[in-house]
Amino acid sequence: RDCLLSRGLGDVYKRQDFMQAKIVVREMAEQLAMDLVEKKLVTDQIVLTVGYDIDNLKIPEIADHYHGEITVDRYGRSVPKHAHGTGNLDAMTASVSRITETTMGLYERIVDPMLLTRRITLVANHLKDADSVKEEPFYEQLDLFSGGFLQTGQKETSRETKQLEKERLEKEKHLQEAMLSVKSKYGKNAILKAADLQEGATTIDRNRQIGGHKA
């Protein structure tokens, strides 16, 4: 059964620069992927929206060099227009590596590194039940430059690459499921990465929240 829904994470954070917000976006991408695995869902599209801080245009070092679009918020205050973009995955997936890679590429592409951020929203679109998605068959690729199909050696290399990637994703899925099992039993902070302990990281605090609010 196709879910045809979206699922996402979003919050308002303290004012952050480009690199600080980048840490948060990576955490959100990893958490979104874990949420999809937990719900047995897959996606093929990621949407990222980053809202900029109201004080950007009050800081001379930023305002004097910003030449992008300016909007007015509901309070009548001028603020740089938010960044918004879509990243498409090459297949339906809940892979943390693929979702994170797509999200970070999107962040680098759409966010102005000069501006301070305030609000971040990350959404997975086109959700489907993981069990309803069948593996895509392997097709020989037509090489227009040589005027024919790929040679046997090239086809074998493509097949081997595809098989290796399939095995890698399967191992990653099992690891994600194992992590979810441990967190379910011992708490969300039972497993942390070194990146979760660096300055600006929010995973630990977010894991302590209930219904989106700090307990």
Where are the regions that the model predicts?
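Basic, low-complexity intrinsically disordered segments
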Residues: 1, 7-215
